[in-house]
Each structure stands twice: as structure tokens, then as C-alpha cells.
Amino acid sequence: MKYDAFVVGGGPAGSTAAWDMARAGLKVALLDRAGRIKPCGGAIPPRLIRDFDIPDHLLVAKITSARMISPTGRFVDIPIENGFVGMVDREDYDEWLRERAGKAGAERLTGTWLRIERDSGKTVVVWRDKVTGEEMKAETRVVIGADGANSQVRNEVPATKIPLVFAYHEIIKAPTTVANYDPTRCDVYYDGRISPDFYGWVFPHGKTASIGMGTELPDVSLKDCTTLLRQMSGLDKEETIRKEGAPIPLQPLDVWDNGKDVVLSGDAAGVVAPSSGEGIYYAHAGGRYAAEAAMAFLKSGKPADLKLARAGFMKEHGTVFKVLRMMQDKYYHSDDRRERFVSLCHDVDVQRMTFESYMNKKMTKFQPLKNLKIGFKNLAHLSGLVPPQWT
């Protein structure tokens, strides 16, 4: 077997890369392990739906507001103006993406990546077939590694270690009688009892809901914290359907390619947003940039073109990632700071700028007076000049 491109990982990043390259007329293989549902909150913003042609039938819920809840129980409801955030179930969503790539011409393979063998200048991918258990081999011109936070393909790249948040959630049957539950609202808990350095969440998914939390600290019990969150949110009596956990990377790698024939994408490249943990949009975007870089390399024969994947992604999204990392570093590490963060969220201009950036995946236009006001409030809270509840 010979391919122009061999994509490892069938999530949003890998499926998008395979879809784009297959539509361009290239011979593409898409290898996925199958049989595992990616633990994920499942939120997709309008720009994702537009840019990647996501049909409405995949949306299990449409979110029109978000509630931010502080350690003392204060909360602010933030409306999503002029639109909604879609929610997807990753089991159905990811399979639909793989099917779409297959319909475009990508050859779907099911199995586990093993290694790359290089002989006489050729790049040979080796994987284990899920059905037969046999080692399979295929020659390819380029490999796209989109195999998640614990990527094995990443071993081919001189990559640095990625900081990880360990996320855990429980899928429950959506309640019908819990007073504080709104099927069109995402609830976000900034509370050190739930997470000492990240947040907890309740995300509606139509007939089900995702409730969970994340942390970088290895000695925190994710299950105990989620149990407490269920009690605090009034969801401890609802039926549990399944429990899932997974690492989430929170920093893009400095290098995404090996300078020869491999380029990374999605979680494998570390492109999950700090502060929010949002990854689906950035996985799609990273997959597209990886495909563009791979196609440039295939056309020119110059391995340097593989660097276009990271360069393009960081040019478009790097500033947003820096701002979100700064916000996480400043506000997520004590209940005093978390209380202050929720206080900031009471400001209507903060709400509008935050959701405009989230919905469209770009920084909002600079508005001198509003930016000055928000900057003053940040300084006042970070310096402790005002009480935590000051809005």
C-alpha cells in the first residue's frame, strides 16, 4: 500500500486533515483505534459550525447563556447574544467526521499506531490491525500525527513536555425536576473545593448532561471533587450513564514537525485553549493547517514547509492563547482570585468581549474607553485594592 499522506488519529484534527487532503485529490489513509469515546464537554462555537460545515442534526443542545459561580455561591448569568453555542456528543460527532473523510476518498483503517520505519529513503508506517492483530505496513510521503494528548507519533518530533490538565466527567441522565438546571445554560464553577487550579462544569447535552472538573495537580481526587460538584448542583440523585477521564494539553508545542516527514496536529500538538480547556475548534483548525502544510510539502518537496502548520496556527490564534494563559495564571489559583474573577464577569463589557472572542475565535476590536475600564478593574482586583465582591 502506498499513500500520499497517512493520518494517525480520527478525532476532529485528524478527520479534518484527511477530509481536506482527500478533497484535494490526494491518496490518504486515516488510522483510528475506534471503540473509545473522547471525554469532552462537547461545546462548539458558531465559527466552527461555519468553517467546517457541521450540520444541525449533530447538535444535541443549543446553549444561549452561561452561569459563572464563585466560591461563595455568588453567580452571574451571561447571555449569548445573537447566536448560540452548539453541544455535540463526541461518539456520534467524531464518527460522522470520519465518515465524511471516507466519503471524500480517504481510506479508513482501524488499528493502533506502532512506529515509522525508514529504509532506502522511504517512509513506512507500521500499525497493528484491530481485527486480525497483525502488523501492517504502508508507504507514505508524509505522516500527520493527530493521536491525542498522549500522542505516540509525537515521539518522532523533538517535542518538549506538554503541561496537562487531568479532566474527568460523568455523563448523567438529564434532570427534569432540578430547579437550578437549565438545558440551555452551561454552568461553570470556580471553586477550590471543586478544582484548586481549573474549574468544574455542568454542560447540558439534550437527553444527558456532562458534569465534571479538571486539575493539573496529581494528588487531587477527580472523582471525589465531581461527587461534591454533583451535590452542590443538586445532580447527585440523577442516573449515571458512564464515567470518563482523559488528559488535556494546555500549551502548544514549540515544534510540530520533525523536519522530514511528520507533522503534528490537535491535542498531539498541544492546541487546547488555556483557561477554558476548549479543544474541538482548535483541533479542527490545527487539522486544516496541518493538511495545508503537508500539501505544500508534497508539492515542493521541501520539509521546511511542514513548519507552516504551526506558523499559520499561531499567527491566527497565538495571541488568544497568551491572553487565556495569563488569565488562568492570575485568577485560577486561590478562592480569593476566583471570587474576584466572577466579580469581573459581572461587567457587561467583559461579558460581550469574552463571548465575541469565543464565538468568532479572534480578539475583539480595541475600544479605548472600555478597555481602559476593564484594565483598571483587573488592576484593582489583582492588587487587592478592592474587596473580592466588588463589581
Swiss-Prot record:
Transmembrane segments: none annotated. InterPro entries: BchP_ChlP_pln/prok (IPR010253), FAD-bd (IPR002938), FAD/NAD-bd_sf (IPR036188), Geranylgeranyl_Rdtase_fam (IPR011777), Geranylgeranyl_reductase (IPR050407). Catalyzes the stepwise hydrogenation of geranylgeraniol to phytol during bacteriochlorophyll A (BchlA) biosynthesis. It catalyses: phytyl diphosphate + 3 NADP(+) = geranylgeranyl diphosphate + 3 NADPH + 3 H(+). This is Geranylgeranyl diphosphate reductase. Belongs to the geranylgeranyl reductase family. ChlP subfamily. Signal peptide: none annotated. The keyword rRNA-binding does not apply. Its EC number is 1.3.1.83. Pathway: Porphyrin-containing compound metabolism; bacteriochlorophyll biosynthesis (light-independent). Keywords: Bacteriochlorophyll biosynthesis, Chlorophyll biosynthesis, NADP, Oxidoreductase, Photosynthesis. It comes from the Bacteria. The gene is bchP. One of its GO terms (biological process) is light-independent bacteriochlorophyll biosynthetic process. It comes from Rhodobacter capsulatus (strain ATCC BAA-309 / NBRC 16581 / SB1003). PANTHER family: GERANYLGERANYL DIPHOSPHATE REDUCTASE, GERANYLGERANYL DIPHOSPHATE REDUCTASE, CHLOROPLASTIC. One of its GO terms (molecular function) is geranylgeranyl reductase activity.
